[in-house]
Structures are given as C-alpha cells and as structure tokens.
Amino acid sequence: MWYSTESNPRIALIKQGYHILAEYNLVKEELKNIYAIPSYACALHWFGVIFVHSGIYAGSVFRFSILLPENFPDDVSLLTVVFSTGILHPHICPQNRTLDLEHFLKEWRKDQHHIWHVLRYIQAIFADPEGSICTGQSSSGDLVVMDEVRNMEALNMLAQSRPEYIKRVQEQAIASRNHIYDRPLTDDPHYIIVEPYCADRHLKIMDQLKSPCWKEATSMDCSQPSEYLGHIDSSRQLDEEEANQLEKLRRARIPEPHRDEAVDFL
C-alpha cells in the first residue's frame, strides 16, 4: 500500500526527526562556544548554553531553551528562544526572557534557514550589542537606533548611559558564573551540565593533549580551517565565519526529501 508523506502522521514524524538530526549535526560542526542539543524527551525542545569571551558581556554564561514549532521545518513561524535567567539586553524581554528574532528573521524558510543561524545571532547580539540596535546611519553620519525593542529600558541605558549599562552587565556576568554549576532543574539526560575542573578526571585528557599522536591528529596542517574557529571576538569575525559556513553549505547542502514523495510500506 502507498502512503503520501503529507497524509501519514507517522511518516511526517520520521521525516521531521531526520530534519532535526541534520540540524543538530550542523550545529555541532559550525559553532564554537555556544552549544545546543535536542532534549531526550522532545526533539522540538532544545537545551542551549553560551559562553561569552569578549566584549562587555565577557565572562557571562547564559543558559537558554529553543522551542521549535510543531510542524518544523515546514512551518514559517519563528523559533522561540527563552533564556533561563533575566538578562539585560535590548532584544531580550525582561518579563518572559524571550529573545526577539523578528529583527533578524521575518519568517522561517526551511530552504534558507537553519538553527545554527539563530545560534549565530545569539552570539552576535552579545558580541556587539550596539550594532544589534542600529538600523543604519543618518545623513550626518550618526547611528540610527531602533524605535522599538523588547527592553526599552536597556536600549535607553545602552544609548544614553553606557557606563551604567556596562556595570549592570558585569554584575550579571558574575551572577551567571556563580550559578554555572547549579543542579539541573530537569532529569533529561540531554541537559547540558557544566562541572568544575577535576584533576583526577581530566588527567587522561591532559596526557592526550601532550602526546605526539594527539598533536598530530589535531594539527592545523592536517585539518580544515573551519575546525579552528576559536572564540568569537567581534561582529566582524561573526560575519566572516557566516560567509565561510554559507559557502560550505552551498558545497554540501543537506538533501531534502521531496514533499510529495510516496513511501512504500510493506
């Protein structure tokens, strides 16, 4: 008997699972210092954490969740990004801690967009918060700031009282590090856990790093440049890496099943 992938819920679910697995593989390959993984309980709910190494948010460690629409990736609705704690940023709502993606994407297009684009955007707003609120330049050369954002108080503080903004952000960074080792609020085995350094536990890894075979295996002479992205230092570096990854995707794009393809069940 023949079933259409459009009319059979089981086939649609399997197809969605392959899409999400492909998205996860891209996330693992394309990004550094920001991590995301589908939860064990539901592939539409992702756990994430970002380590910020530079800029005024340097030293911050922020956890977040990504909620995919039920019909992902066919649904044009945007993903929902919710941070675990309140964060002072113009694009993060102080009430529900959600990230505004509408300045970045108007709608989701599965043939153009990937979850790693959203993760890259998260990196960008922390690497260059001023750049994230600017829409261009006036005729006099002054930066034009957005009229409306999720957190207007943060926008006004960043634009008019930058020292106070930096002070608040640095206090926030310290608080985020103080809670980095907190016990997880869920027993989901895919929850990203950060543990303190333990010499006994990491001695084998350190020995591997010192061994000639390990150095040879991780030598820059033997590996592709994209494997050595390092941490994000500026929005310029984000743009350069974005261009590199888009070129990589063009060379090896994920094959997508035909939407109307029939599946033969025996």
From Swiss-Prot:
Residues covered by the UBC core domain: 15-178
Matching Gene3D superfamilies: Ubiquitin Conjugating Enzyme
InterPro entries: UBQ-conjugat_E2_core, UBQ-conjugating_enzyme/RWD
Origin: domain of life: Eukaryota
TM ranges: none
Classification via SUPFAM superfamilies: UBC-like (SSF54495)
Pfam families linked: UQ_con (PF00179)
Signal peptide segment: none
Protein family per UniProt: Belongs to the ubiquitin-conjugating enzyme family. FTS subfamily.
Full protein name: Protein crossbronx-like
Species, as recorded: Drosophila erecta (Fruit fly)
